[in-house]
Amino acid sequence: MQHLEDVKINNSIVWFKPNAQPNITCRFFTESTEHLIWASKNGNGKKWKFNYEATKNLIEDRLNPKGKQTRNVWAIPLTPKAEKRAGKHPTQKPIELLRRIILACSDEGDTVLDPFLGSGTTSFVAKMLKRNSIGIEKENKYLPIIKKRLNPPQKTWDDIELEVIR
């Protein structure tokens, strides 16, 4: 991260998992949250995007009533089995989590970066929402899951170019 000065941390979002996995060791608190970092590229005078008015209607859960200012804590269940058809990843995020952040912080045609692509959820959702995406994943063992997820055999989708850089 030698160019960290080019990145602005805009906000953090706490993902509260109402159906978190139990703590089977009974030696610490049950882990029921994760943190997302919303960052943007600094420079050239361009401001980051935040669709404030839209977030009041697109984000609704028990912590965020529809029509109200959106908080940075979102209650979203764990990734359902149906979203793991391309394969399992130990930290896969639910589509709804990425849908919210991408709709809130970008417009159609914008580019979304995920430096920890994992199973490809961010790129998958970005494509569904007509955004471009750049994903980085250092673990080669997850490439088959990413490829399967981003190149589904469906006639309704455009082909997604996937470039593997080693």
Please report, for each region that a protein language model flagged, where it lies by residue.
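Core catalytic lobe of class I
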Residues: M1-I145
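S-adenosyl-L-methionine
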Residues: K147-R166
